[in-house]
């Protein structure tokens, strides 16, 4: 049985979120929560929130226990970029891209 949780339009670039996602890929759910608790990155807070949601989905919908859950896949795709303008000298301007990402976690029961 697989359980999925998504976070779309997360306000962090996919490159930064992938650094944290690579740390917990393939881990048990409880071990992944420990790793995320001790990480001081913003992306760790985002992924921890999604992982909690996926664990709750598995417990409520499938009746699984947290000790039996493992992260089957976790992937981060880039979302749309929000364009902003930064004023510069002599009336010029630069474009700033506020990048977003879509995060997906799939949990499966260990057998």
From Swiss-Prot:
The entry's keywords: Ribonucleoprotein, Ribosomal protein, RNA-binding, rRNA-binding
For this protein, the record's HAMAP family field holds: Ribosomal_uL22_B
Q: Which family does it belong to?
A: Belongs to the universal ribosomal protein uL22 family.
Q: Which InterPro entries match?
A: Ribosomal_uL22, Ribosomal_uL22_bac/chlpt-type, Ribosomal_uL22_bac/org-type, Ribosomal_uL22_CS, Ribosomal_uL22_sf
**Coiled-coil features, chain-numbered ranges:** none
Q: Classify the source by domain of life.
A: Bacteria
Asked if Phosphoprotein is a keyword of the record, the answer is no
GO BP: any one term: translation
**Disulfide bridge positions per record:** none
Query: An example Gene Ontology cellular component term from the record?
Result: cytosolic large ribosomal subunit
Per its record, how is this protein called by name? Large ribosomal subunit protein uL22
In alphabetical order, the GO MF annotations are: rRNA binding; structural constituent of ribosome
Tell me the gene name.
rplV
Q: List the Pfam families hit by this protein, alphabetically.
A: Ribosomal_L22 (PF00237)
**Gene3D superfamilies under this entry?**
Ribosomal protein L22/L17 (3.90.470.10)
What is the role of the protein in this entry?
A: This protein binds specifically to 23S rRNA; its binding is stimulated by other ribosomal proteins, e.g. L4, L17, and L20. It is important during the early stages of 50S assembly. It makes multiple contacts with different domains of the 23S rRNA in the assembled 50S subunit and ribosome. The globular domain of the protein is located near the polypeptide exit tunnel on the outside of the subunit, while an extended beta-hairpin is found that lines the wall of the exit tunnel in the center of the 70S ribosome.
What is the protein's quaternary organization? Part of the 50S ribosomal subunit.
């Amino acid at each position: 049985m697989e359980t999925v949780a998504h976070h779309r339009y997360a306000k962090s670039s996919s490159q930064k979120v992938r650094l944290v996602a690579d740390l917990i890929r393939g881990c048990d759910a409880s071990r992944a929560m420990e790793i995320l608790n001790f990480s001081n990155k913003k992306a760790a807070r985002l992924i921890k929130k999604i992982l909690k949601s996926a664990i709750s989905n598995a417990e409520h919908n499938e009746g699984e226990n947290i000790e039996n859950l493992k992260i089957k896949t976790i992937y981060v795709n880039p979302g749309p970029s929000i364009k902003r303008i930064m004023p510069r000298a002599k009336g010029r301007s630069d474009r700033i891209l506020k990048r977003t990402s879509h995060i997906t976690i799939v949990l499966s029961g260990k057998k």
